[in-house]
Amino acid sequence: MTVYHFVGIKGTGMSPLAQILHDNGYTVQGSDIEKFIFTQTALEKRNITILPFSAENIKPGMTVIAGNAFPDTHPEIEKAMSEGIPVIRYHKFLGDYMKKFTSVAVTGAHGKTSTTGLLAHVIQNAKPTSFLIGDGTGQGNENSEYFVFEACEYRRHFLSYQPDYAIMTNIDFDHPDYFSSIDDVFDAFQEMALQVNKGIIACGDDEHLPKIHANVPVVYYGTGEENDFQARNIVKSTEGTTFDVFVRNTFYDTFYIPAYGHHNVLNSLAVIALCHYEEIDSSIIKHALKSFGGVKRRFNEKQLGDQVLIDDYAHHPTEIKVTIEAARQKYPDREIVAVFQPHTFTRTQQFLDEFAESLSGADCVYLCDIFGSARENAGKLTIGDLQGKIHNAKLIEEDDTSVLKAHDKAVLIFMGAGDIQKYMRAYENVMA
């Protein structure tokens, strides 16, 4: 049997795919940078070998699965190609692999990871399920009926997939290094919609999704009257959120989620709609929604002295806004402090005013230096440009996080898609 070698095994899609293949009895290994990335923990638990990048890793008899961030000139990929060893890009491999199952793609500008995690949690309570979540979590099951996976619109990678179902959470302008406009983003989703085989579950409250055309039924969810699945009587508390669901104006059931913010009601509604469509009993859905513990790097809380620390992946103005709102729902009487690390110069430049506006929803703002991704390293923009647009915003360094101690009993939200976690760890060490 072939050995699957993953080039970039710590990637948020690559790591869970490696886990799935391992769980199904395949021999898996991979290579990546040596710096710790949170996605490697699940690999280490399975004793999957992680090697430093080297052309020497490539051996005859392997199948190489290449991460999308790595060009054909990468030493490992180059060696495999020169020696006739099969090289398959991540999204192409995934597109072929899912054909064995009833597949559900979860896509959208925001909410993909949380909704994928929630759907996987709920549906596996009813039927054997394999899943691939963009927080680095994967699970394979040889007897799976369903394959639930996160599908990213970046560089139109999701067009490699022809899923049975697609959940579309929203359309928004992001990835300005690739997409030219909101219309360009919409066109990508429209193209994706035409590749779905059985049905689309889409948010009808979204400005753009109601314009989607498809060759399969499109079921809409949201709070608006025109939706097929409508959440009504939403009650938010410090314990979570309760809401009634009406299916085409007929009462279906009442649901409780231990989660905060309007976006989590919509994510749950998408899952309820898909499960209803697949005739999963509402009692199973209700029970599973109650017990969902969330996904990695999405509103992950910990107590530190009299402060609450929250780690969140929010890196777009829309995500920052809803994360701050969720914190206010759970902690209405506490000071909310945002510690934000912008991710990529192109995104920061594109959304400078929007970042300033969304961060202003916090009581106090600290800014970390801009994190350049693997796709870019420098820009003319500096963090000072964003600081100048936010009243009283302060800059924070990894080696001087002690200023956060001044916020007695506050909720500190560390947000970003780069390495914002090192700032949170540094602060925890200061407080130890």
Curated annotation (Swiss-Prot):
Major localization class: cytoplasm
Broadest EC class assigned to this enzyme: ligase
Subcellular location: Cytoplasm
EC identifiers of the protein: 6.3.2.8
Residues engaged in binding ATP: G108, A109, H110, G111, K112, T113, S114
Xref: Gene3D superfamilies: Mur ligase, C-terminal domain, Mur-like, catalytic domain, NAD(P)-binding Rossmann-like Domain
Family matches, as Pfam families: Mur_ligase (PF01225), Mur_ligase_C (PF02875), Mur_ligase_M (PF08245)
Disulfide bonds: none
Reactions that this protein is recorded to catalyse: UDP-N-acetyl-alpha-D-muramate + L-alanine + ATP = UDP-N-acetyl-alpha-D-muramoyl-L-alanine + ADP + phosphate + H(+)
Gene Ontology, cellular component aspect: cytoplasm
Family in the record: Belongs to the MurCDEF family.
Reported function: Cell wall formation.
NCBIfam families assigned: murC (TIGR01082)
Protein name per UniProt: UDP-N-acetylmuramate--L-alanine ligase
Organism, scientific name: Bacillus subtilis (strain 168)
Phylogenetic classification of the source organism: Bacteria, Bacillati, Bacillota, Bacilli, Bacillales
Gene, per the UniProt record: murC
